[in-house]
């Protein structure tokens, strides 16, 4: 009975969004209320625990998630205000007029780099917004951005998910990182192919799409494997994305038509740098404050810190914000400074920021309710009930379903890192019981979690906010589900065969 009750919030959310086509904010409010009632009466959760669990979830929603979403969309809106987005659009067109190459470059290449550096929604929001400005349909832009924001998530935010997994399981980070890359290897070829096919599904484009997918997937795999094997979790996504960008740009230039090659760009280097100054400065600040510079990061992390302690389940949960290394703050600084460089006035920038807040009000409601829901499911024991039931039911076939648990974690929480916190220990424990390598099975949690990112309601809320498409969450979820299912099935087969 408890298993049925535990599953209800997840099923309800999917049904409301995908089949009743209810907006994200309304779906999440209803699902949150039902989850609270189940926790109170089905899991004997006290009112105090319920209140503090929701408060903890709401705080986690505001920071880092909502602050980062707000600042990511703010950066895009500033580019519109200063009219520098037109220069960025012209530059993408100068690289290639081929829509497939533009989509792959923006979502897999640039989006992968944003995920590697910052994570928490930037890799969905910014590429989707730029694609829309290039003339792509909002639903298409949201869907391809979600699908692309999968593989890189494993090592997002400078490797945070795998670093957390290593800490939770007490396993070697180099071995975990290497296993994650190996389990994702097939997807590194398939995801670029899917992106190319969705952009241009014509049969005559298939040979070109396959060749480019093999090329991009190959450099991603080699780069990520070497980085994971010899450097750890911090750099695989960064190196893989940079190599992908280089290969895609070179391919676009080399395969351009004679007319494209003859057409000279009218853009000056100064104008290009000025237009890109927002993202260049943001990347610079993110790299500067990342674990790549441990002494500086340590100094910044220990200054201007907000700490809040909350009593949940007879223990104390700690909520901490290090403002000087906060990705949202870095996004704001990079955007604000670059906005001034691009000619905007201080007052104009604050008006743009306020308009962005108003634009995202439904997204704020959706994300706060979803993270509150996931936190209540965690602290009341619902998630543990679902995961344990799956592990018990599958027995020796468990490795086939291990990625499903990771996927479930990300679907509920919206975060690969949170999924690893919830289920990392469980995966390692089951591995010992069925005589499978804990390193291999724990890595499968992260790999499954990357697939869950495609259909996470939080990620979908970010994608809809980027294109001002609030209310279309159900449509995007239905479009994304088949790809997420295929993703988890493929990774499950890989994990099972080599376990």
What does each model-identified segment do?
Residues 3, 60-65, 92-106, 134-140, ...:
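Membrane-interfacial loop-to-helix junctions in multi-pass transporters
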Residues 98-129, 133, 364-377, 394-426:
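Hydrophobic alpha-helical transmembrane segments of multi-pass integral membrane proteins
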Residues 63-65, 76-83, 113-123, 151-159, ...:
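Short helix-coil transition sites and intra-membrane helix breaks within transmembrane domains
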Residues 146-251, 461-494:
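Membrane-core helix-loop-helix motifs of multi-pass transport proteins
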Residues 100-112, 138-151, 172-188, 192, ...:
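Alpha-helical transmembrane segments of multi-pass membrane proteins
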Residues 240, 259-406:
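Transmembrane helical segments that form the transport core of multi-pass membrane transport proteins
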Residues 202-214, 255-274:
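Flexible interhelical linker loops that connect adjacent transmembrane helices
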Residues 2-3, 13-49, 71-82, 248-257, ...:
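Structural signal for alpha-helical transmembrane segments and their membrane-water exit/capping regions
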């Amino acid at each position: 009975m408890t298993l049925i009750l535990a599953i209800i919030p997840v099923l309800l959310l999917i049904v409301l969004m995908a089949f009743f086509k209810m907006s994200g904010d309304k779906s999440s409010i209803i699902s949150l209320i039902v989850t609270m009632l189940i926790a109170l009466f089905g899991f004997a959760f006290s009112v105090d625990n319920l209140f503090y669990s929701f408060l903890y979830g709401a705080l986690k929603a505001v920071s880092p998630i909502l602050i980062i979403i707000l600042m990511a969309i703010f950066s895009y809106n500033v580019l519109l205000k200063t009219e520098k987005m037109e220069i960025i659009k012209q530059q993408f067109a100068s690289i290639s007029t081929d829509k497939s190459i533009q989509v792959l470059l923006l979502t897999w290449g640039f989006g992968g780099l944003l995920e590697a550096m910052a994570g928490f929604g930037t890799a969905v929001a910014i590429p989707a917004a730029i694609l829309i400005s290039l003339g792509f349909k909002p639903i298409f832009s949201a869907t391809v951005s979600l699908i692309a924001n999968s593989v890189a998530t494993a090592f997002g935010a400078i490797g945070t998910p795998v670093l957390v997994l290593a800490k939770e399981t007490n396993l070697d980070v180099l071995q975990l990182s290497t296993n994650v890359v190996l389990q994702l290897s097939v997807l590194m070829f398939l995801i670029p192919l899917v992106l190319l096919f969705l952009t241009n599904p014509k049969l005559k484009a298939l040979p070109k799409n396959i060749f480019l997918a093999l090329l991009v997937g190959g450099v991603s795999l080699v780069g990520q494997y070497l980085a994971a094997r010899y450097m750890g979790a911090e750099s695989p996504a960064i190196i893989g994305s940079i190599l992908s960008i280089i290969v895609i740009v070179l391919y676009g230039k080399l395969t351009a038509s004679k007319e494209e090659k003859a057409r000279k760009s009218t853009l000056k280097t100064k104008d290009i740098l000025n237009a890109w100054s927002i993202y260049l400065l943001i990347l610079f600040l993110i790299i500067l404050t990342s674990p790549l510079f441990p002494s500086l990061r340590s100094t910044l992390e220990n200054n201007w810190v907000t700490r809040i302690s909350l009593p949940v389940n007879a223990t104390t949960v700690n909520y901490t914000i290090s403002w000087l290394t906060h990705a949202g703050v870095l996004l704001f600084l990079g955007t604000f400074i670059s906005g001034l460089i691009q000619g905007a006035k201080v007052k104009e920038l604050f008006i743009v920021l306020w308009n962005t807040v108003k634009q995202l009000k439904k997204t704020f409601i959706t994300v706060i309710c979803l993270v509150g829901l996931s936190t209540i499911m965690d602290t009341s024991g619902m998630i543990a009930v679902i995961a344990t039931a799956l592990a018990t039911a599958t027995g020796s076939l468990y490795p086939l379903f291990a990625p499903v648990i990771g996927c479930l974690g990300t679907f509920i929480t919206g975060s690969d890192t949170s999924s690893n916190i919830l289920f990392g220990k469980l995966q390692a424990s089951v591995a010992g019981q069925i005589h499978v390598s804990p390193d291999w099975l724990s890595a499968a949690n992260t790999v499954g979690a990357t697939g869950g990112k495609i259909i996470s309601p939080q990620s979908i809320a970010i994608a809809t906010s980027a294109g001002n498409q609030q209310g279309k969450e159900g449509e995007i979820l239905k479009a994304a589900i088949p790809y997420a299912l295929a993703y988890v099935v493929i990774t499950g087969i890989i994990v099972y065969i080599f376990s």
